[in-house]
Structures are given as structure tokens and as C-alpha cells.
């Protein structure tokens, strides 16, 4: 019997992880699984949470998640994994990052220690015995846990990717719907600034919509992105150094754009099916010079369709789940 899929916490538009939640929700429903998405509040006492696969985020989105010994939990960000001691199985979900250290994590993804489960998804089985686990909240000897390393994906399903969108007439403007930060670990203003300056000098209006101040619907973000003359993704210094692969390039490509990135790791993850330049100012000019390279755009869209949707991620997650049966 198929397990039920439970997406837990972060309703759409309320948190970065709400977008991966939405991707999994759509994908598992498409794959024919009974799929539910619950807010992080007291569980519905009339719902049977046994024999489920839970998918969630443990730092701020799992305060009320029901834990039982018949269900498997795929959780990203775990301040204290001992919270899930009563679960049948816990999988620590991580991004494929190098030298990643923050208030929760201190790890470096090493593919040689892992089993590849699908495009951009890797499984590292737990070690036997206790390990030393330390972060800003815990310093203890605890049992190890299985780990799944992933890259995020586009929010479109394969059959929603419309190749005709590459021919759409664009406006002399760019709408960026995301986060531009001038401080903190994810500071990216210093990389955005030279790109925005090139927009201004070349008659391209740059519009920034802060997703936290003015959250937009998925449809609104996709439409604004498609209207933009370029589909751009500029990573913060920390993202470039840790080689994190986020979802924006995959989304932009799937919406019909030439992929543009200042991250070498994202370029490699796309198997070269996008434009890479570490210099954001030059990336603007590279994008403008190639924005109607329809063969390259088509190849990128096909690559994302085959490798970087949540159908891929859901199928890989199921393979990790089956490793524990």
C-alpha cells in the first residue's frame, strides 16, 4: 500500500520552504499519491497520520508536527534531531553544499560517500553508533541519521513547461521577485549592484519586488519573469563559495528564458545549458547578446524538463524511502 504524503508547515508564500513544499505537493499528487498539506498547528485529531511520509522544515515549521513510529520524516534544518526520536525513521535533508556552516549545520557534501538516487539527489546512510552533534542549540552524543542531499527544482511540472514561451516578446525591463539583502550571511547586494547599474546604463528598467514585504502568487511571479527581457539569477558570495544550487535558474529556464547565473556550480548542475559569468556586470551583456539564442534556450528547457522538476525530486525521495524498507 502506498504511504500517504504529508507536506507539513509553511503555507505557500509564507517562507522560502513553502515553494519546495508546493513543488512536492504538486508532484506527488501528479504521481497518484494521497497528498495533504497541513499548516504547522495542532494536528487534526480525526486524521490518521500513521504510515505516512512527512516532508517539512524543522527550524521554524515543525513545532506541532505529529511524530509516530510508523511514519518516515524527510526534514530539512534540524536544530535538534532528538525531537524525532519517536519516529520510525528520520532523513536529514540537506542542500548539496560545500563547507556549509550556520546556526544549525556544519557539513560539506561529498558525493563519494553517497549513493546517487536521481538527478541532483544523493543518499548518505547513517553511521552505526553515536556521533558528536553540535550547533547553536545542541552539544551532545546522539545517534546518526540518514541524509539526503538535494538541489531544488522548478515549480512547473514537466507537462507545464511551454516551449513557445521562449518566443514571447519581452519588455525593456526586468522584474526580480526574490530577496536582495545588504547584510548578513546571504548578503547579495554587492553582486546585484553592478548588474543593476548595467541595466540603468543600457535603458533597461529594473524592478525589485521583495517577497517578504509584498508576497506575490506563483502565477504573478511567473508572468513578471516572462515579461522580463532577461531571466536572471545572481547568487550571494556565500552561495557561490558553498556551491549551493537553488531553484531560480531552473525556474527561469522552465518559464522560457535563457538561464543566467554567476554561480559556477549552478552552471555545472545545468550541464552547461545556461550562461555563466562570475562578473554580474558582464553577465548582463552576455545575456543580452544571447537572449534570442533559441536553440540554447530550447536545450536548457529540455534539460530542466528531464532533470529539474519536482517529479524528479519526488521519485528520488521515494527511492530514499525504499532504502529503509
Describe each PLM feature range.
Residues 236, 284-288:
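Regular secondary-structure segments
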Residues 287-323:
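A charged, aromatic-enriched C-terminal amphipathic alpha-helix characteristic of glycosyltransferases
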Residues 246-249, 281, 297:
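Short amphipathic alpha-helical surface patches that serve as generic macromolecular interface elements
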Residues 2-273, 305, 310-311, 315, ...:
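Nucleotide-sugar donor-binding catalytic core of glycosyltransferases
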Residues 6-7, 230-232, 283, 296, ...:
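Generic signal for short, ordered secondary-structure residues
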Residues 259-263, 274-278, 290-294:
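Short amphipathic alpha-helical segments, especially helix-boundary/capping motifs
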